[in-house]
Amino acid sequence: MRISRFAALLLACALLVLPAAGLAASTSLSVAIVADDHLALRPLELNHRDVVSLLNLVYEGLFEIDDNYQPQPKLAYAYSFSNDGRKVQVTLRDDISFHNGQTLTSADVVATLDYMLELAGFNENLDSEVPVADRGLYYSTFYSIKSWEATDEQTIVFTLRRASYGSLYALTFPILPASQVAADMPAGTGPYKYDGYEQGSAIWLTANDGWWNLPPQVRYVRASIYDTAEQALNAFDTQSVDIAMTRSINASRYSGSLNTFSITARTRQLEV
């Protein structure tokens, strides 16, 4: 599967607005995102829509949601449910490496989940004293997943809170190296890796030559950081950036333009 030149940039953004000409031959693209000046790039703790969308280029989950809203294996190679539907066994792909060269193992999946649970602060009854805004982006995972265990380096068994195929939707969170789950800018497994970050200014990404899938068509991505959506759209209007992420109500102002076009896509929350 070759990632398209637009979907490869922002796999889950609410809306893309792009210039109509000149992108196909480009080796780099610039995108406007809205984020705080003091943003920490910790993918399990983010709550900035634009940044989460951007970092879907850097990180991958066990499963991803396809265009038909169905979960499909990503870092997972295979999966199977127990007869009673209360457990699901997931086998990892054996050709996955993080950007730091480390091979993906089940220990990384377990450590990622352990840290997510720590952030959420849930007890056995899913009670938590942690404010919702501070529980991390993926705390709802634990409404479906009760416990997890690595049975070997390539296999994880998940115990579910209820028998449901829908539990696979909960396994789309990004997998991080066990040693970097709480780190800033941890290594990922995706088609792009970090090339730099200046708070309040920009995030730079470069193509991951060691990616397990076919290489992306765009080599470099610069994400310029703006305080507001209006500032981001103004940057697009003045051609300071190639892409602006925004909601459809804002994109409608470009509907009659011959120099731009819009692409609508789902976020992790299935917004449009």
Task: Show where each model-derived region lies.
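Gly/Pro-rich hinge or "lid" segments in bacterial periplasmic/extracellular proteins
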Residues: 159-220, 228-231
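Ligand-site clamp/hinge motif
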Residues: 209-254
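A bilobed periplasmic-binding-protein/Venus flytrap-type ligand-binding module shared by bacterial periplasmic
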Residues: 93, 206-209, 262-272
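N-terminal lobe/hinge region of extracytoplasmic solute-binding protein
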Residues: 32-83, 114, 187
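Ligand-binding "clamshell"
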Residues: 252-266
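Surface-exposed binding/hinge segments that line
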Residues: 80, 91, 126-179
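Aromatic- and charge-enriched surface segment that lines or borders ligand/interaction sites
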Residues: 77-125
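Short, well-ordered beta-strand elements
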Residues: 27-35, 87-90, 109-112, 156-158, ...
